[in-house]
């Protein structure tokens, strides 16, 4: 009961003080229909952590089978999630945003020729396929030349990643596509309908201070806008999403 992890790391933010996309998410979840108590939050987080423990046990079962069948030295084990969960942080739940609780996920790998260690540069789930292909000796140029992402294998020996991580969102709670660029300590978020967001995750890991309106960060904003425009045609992106529905 005294576990600090049962409490949100960021207290609920009043609806009127939320950013535009978070307001849409709260409206999409019909936030006024529920009176979420502190006990509800703790129970929800406890259940989430219980799920993690359950998955951990099942991964142990898989590794046990690999060891008993003498396949562990010929197997690459990868643990990954496609998204996180806000779990009440900022008063938000589920996924659907670029905040760290939603977008940041674990990525762990073990197998032949993978030395134990850690890698702190931002990477993407898009990097998984190129990484596994290189570890398996497969050239994606021969079989899947259209594949996005970059191999993380150089990172196993300490090579730093220089490419930014790109993210897109155009699902529940969005009235237009959102895009995000994570480049080192910086996170930039853009939607044609909303004010821009810029966070310095080194000094503000909870993403509580949007630096985009601050003239002191005009250089960073200009650089991110150029990256954004080089990568996305936002009008075409919006049209493609609507036509696909």
Regions found by a protein language model. Give the residues of each.
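Charged catalytic carboxylate motif
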Residues: 54, 58, 127, 131, ...
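C-terminal cap/loop subdomain of S1 sulfatases and analogous C-terminal strand-loop tails that border
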Residues: 83-89, 110, 115, 126-129, ...
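Long, internal low-complexity/basic segments
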Residues: 29-40, 128, 211-245
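Hydrophobic residues in alpha-helical segments
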Residues: 66-67, 155-156, 212
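Basic side chains
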Residues: 45, 90, 95, 104, ...
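Active-site-proximal cap/lid insertion segments
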Residues: 1-122, 135-144, 207, 215, ...
């Amino acid at each position: 009961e005294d576990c600090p992890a049962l409490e949100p790391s960021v207290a609920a933010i009043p609806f009127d003080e939320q950013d535009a996309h978070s307001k849409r998410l709260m409206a999409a979840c019909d936030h006024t229909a529920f009176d979420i108590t502190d006990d509800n939050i703790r129970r929800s987080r406890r259940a989430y952590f219980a799920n993690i423990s359950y998955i951990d046990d099942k991964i142990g079962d898989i590794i046990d089978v690999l060891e008993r069948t003498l396949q562990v030295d010929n197997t690459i084990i990868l643990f990954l999630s496609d998204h996180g969960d806000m779990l009440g942080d900022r008063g938000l739940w589920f996924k659907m945003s670029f905040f760290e609780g939603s977008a940041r996920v674990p990525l762990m790998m073990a197998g032949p020729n993978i030395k134990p260690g850690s890698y702190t540069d931002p990477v993407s789930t898009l990097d998984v396929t190129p990484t596994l292909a290189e570890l398996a000796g497969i050239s994606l140029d021969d079989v899947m030349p259209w594949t996005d992402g970059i191999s993380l294998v150089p990172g196993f020996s300490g090579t730093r990643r220089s490419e930014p991580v790109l993210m897109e969102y155009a699902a529940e709670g969005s009235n237009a596509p959102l895009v995000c660029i994570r480049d080192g300590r910086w996170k930039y978020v853009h939607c044609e309908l909303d004010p821009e967001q810029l966070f310095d995750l080194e000094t503000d890991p909870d993403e509580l201070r949007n630096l985009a309106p601050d003239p002191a960060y005009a250089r960073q904003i200009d650089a991110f806008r150029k990256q954004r425009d080089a990568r996305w045609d936002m009008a075409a992106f919006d049209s493609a999403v609507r036509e696909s529905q």
